[in-house]
Amino acid sequence: MTYTLRPYQQDAVYDAIDWLKSTIEPGLIEAYTCAGKSLIIAEIAKRITAMTGKKILVLQPNKELLQQNAEKYKLTGEPYSLFSASANSKSVRHNVVFGTALSVKNQLNSFCEKFCLIILDEADASLTPSILKIIDSIRSKNPNLRVLGLTSSPYKLGQGYIYRADINGKQVPEDKAKEPFFTKQIVHISGR
């Protein structure tokens, strides 16, 4: 079974890869619910792995998203690993690894400098102390680590927007974005 990306998904993949090639700053893809974020993740992971030969860690907040993202990646025909106690698998054998935060955090020694990219699904909910610890740990082994987030809601209650600049480069006022993790919203896919 294969898949075909919709034009807006393909554009998101191209824009994300351009961003990842140009900077080590964290970038964010905002895409409405049902926009096919799992397929976007799969295509980015497949292409970056093919370009670099290095490992990619895809982090999601729960087993259900882990299974959904892994199933979409399976459509690429490329092998992948799961690293999640809730999925009964803790492997980093293949270049693309789908993991849950707690399982990865509890075995950070399994994640080395060979990881060039962390993709955060549900980035608005994923920016927890555990995720930040994972990023810091892998970045200490690979200072060129890239981080890419995907979300349908780039706003976190109590903190505001999770990015510093919108897709047009306009800075988000400090009162609307308290210490945002992502440097820029690099893609915006609206439901309209």
Predicted regions, residues:
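Conserved pre-motif I regulatory segment
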Residues: 1-30
